[in-house]
């Protein structure tokens, strides 16, 4: 197995699915992997049934990806809103890692005090600081701010190893200017809203 294959398997085992466009963000600018080798490696892994490849064709508000989506052979196949949430989660991991950070934990559909969150991400930033964020991908414009209140109490009722109250990131196609007028801060945590294109991500996390 080549180094590139090992890296691809490690990435996709963490995020469960990733698009060809997301792969290019990781490997496209690395001189040790040219485009031809990258495409050849993906094709080889699909022909050997290590990966499965499906058309993506997602065009939803600010999130667009018309390339292909790759799954580990045997992994769950996402469709509809679940696919959008899965790919937005993968995009978050890709952007965090390509910015020089290192994702340590990545969980989908996590429970905190009987409330469901779409994602939990723990990563170290460029300076070695550990950061934790809870992420909700809101596609229905039904944001309930009360869900994020009293997090210091709620995180005690979770199997996730929180070491402090995490920040909250809500990914939404809604009107960000209106959302940013909400009372987003209390004494312990912050809620940040970001569009589906994840523009200005690092201003939020």
Across the structure, where does each feature detected by a protein language model lie?
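Solvent-exposed, charged helical/coil patches
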Residues: 64-110
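Nuclease-adjacent, charged terminal/linker segments that flank catalytic cores
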Residues: 1-76
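A short, well-structured beta->alpha microelement
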Residues: 107-123, 145-157, 193, 197-200
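Domain-level recognition of nuclease-like catalytic cores that cleave nucleotide substrates
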Residues: 174-205
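Active-site metal-binding core of divalent-cation-utilizing nuclease and nuclease-like domains
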Residues: 95-141
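Hydrophobic, Leu/Ile/Phe/Ala-enriched alpha-helical segments that form helix-helix packing faces
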Residues: 27, 42-46, 92-100, 152-159, ...
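Catalytic cores of nucleic-acid endonucleases
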Residues: 132, 137-186
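Well-ordered, non-membrane alpha-helical segments in soluble/globular domains
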Residues: 37, 83-92, 144-157
């Amino acid at each position: 197995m080549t180094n590139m294959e090992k890296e691809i398997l490690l990435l996709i085992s963490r995020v469960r699915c990733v698009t060809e466009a997301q792969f290019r963000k990781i490997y496209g600018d690395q001189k040790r992997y040219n485009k031809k080798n990258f495409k050849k490696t993906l094709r080889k892994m699909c022909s050997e049934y290590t990966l499965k490849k499906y058309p993506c064709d997602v065009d939803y508000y600010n999130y667009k990806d018309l390339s292909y989506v790759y799954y580990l052979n045997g992994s769950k196949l996402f469709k509809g809103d679940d696919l959008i949430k899965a790919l937005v989660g993968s995009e978050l991991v890709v952007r965090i890692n390509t910015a020089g950070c290192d994702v340590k934990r990545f969980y989908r559909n996590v429970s905190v005090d009987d409330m469901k969150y779409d994602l939990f991400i723990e990563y170290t930033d460029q300076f070695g600081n550990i950061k934790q964020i809870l992420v909700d991908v809101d596609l229905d414009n039904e944001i309930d701010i009360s869900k994020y209140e009293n997090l210091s109490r709620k995180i005690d009722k979770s199997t996730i190893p929180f070491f402090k109250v995490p920040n909250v990131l809500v990914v939404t196609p809604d009107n960000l200017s209106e959302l940013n007028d909400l009372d987003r801060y209390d004494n312990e945590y912050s809620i940040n809203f970001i569009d589906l294109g994840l523009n200005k991500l690092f201003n939020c996390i």
